[in-house]
């Protein structure tokens, strides 16, 4: 029997429109279970290697990972004692975190398209992974 993903409630701190969390060996990510939530999630794994399971797709990453996970797309956490990752940074935001109409303006069409593609998950590679990852890791 295939387990159903658990629903995760994401609650940004008061006065914030998104959440930011960073995990490492001293502060491990406790959400290693198969789960989903309505928020879009951007995950940067600094270093290490491991398995990523997003939706029905299972694959492996090396030398870190940068993933954009769409709304309600089931996935597992990426850092545990076996991966050797230095850290994992997670940004979670609702699709309308910048307002209901922000992504409808012409200048945001490509970002809106990226969010739609992310409904199946997007893994970034090469210099994009490194450049964006460094900016996420505060």
Give, region by region, the residue ranges found by the protein language model.
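A hydrophobic/aromatic-rich effector-binding and dimerization subdomain
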Residues: 2-17, 73-137
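Generic protein-terminus/edge-of-domain signal
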Residues: 1-66, 72
């Amino acid at each position: 029997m295939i387990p159903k993903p658990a629903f995760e409630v994401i609650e940004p701190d008061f006065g914030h429109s998104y959440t930011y969390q960073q995990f490492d060996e001293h502060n491990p990510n406790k959400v290693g279970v198969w789960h989903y939530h309505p928020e879009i999630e951007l995950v940067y794994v600094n270093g290490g290697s491991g398995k990523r399971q997003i939706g029905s797709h299972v694959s492996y990453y090396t030398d870190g990972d940068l993933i954009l996970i769409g709304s309600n797309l089931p996935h597992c956490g990426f850092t545990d004692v076996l991966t050797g990752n230095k850290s994992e940074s997670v940004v979670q935001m609702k699709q309308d975190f910048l307002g209901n109409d922000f992504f409808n303006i012409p200048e945001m069409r490509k970002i809106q398209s990226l969010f739609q593609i992310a409904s199946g998950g997007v893994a970034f590679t090469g210099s994009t992974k490194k450049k964006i990852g460094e900016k996420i890791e505060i």
